[in-house]
């Protein structure tokens, strides 16, 4: 019910076909059952997003830049210098992530229209033209010296997270 290509890449399952770029990144997930061979010269046209497809774009460093969904809406991602996702933009909302080392400390979102602009002051300082909004703030609490979450704080509500012996929430 599945077929795989070189390097174990999933090529086809019962519902989808998968296409990859020369770096091994998934670029298209489609239900279309016919496509050109590599020799036809039409591969790039075929790999362009069409309704019903998932299309993926990648940064030069292998980080996911965007996903275009079957409904045509696009989700975009930004990362910090350490490769941690710091932003997701989708459907008019900006979702932000603040990290403490290797774990997410805070996440929040706000309307994309409220996003502050980056400006350069007369002294050459790069800053924002207004404070970034913080709505729907979520704070994560972790077991000391581990990556296992123990609590989630949303507004004035506190939730405990119970995990098994290997750190999976139960």
Please give the residue ranges for each predicted region.
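Short, ordered secondary-structure scaffold segments
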Residues: 2-51, 57, 94-170
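Repeat-solenoid scaffold signature
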Residues: 59-90
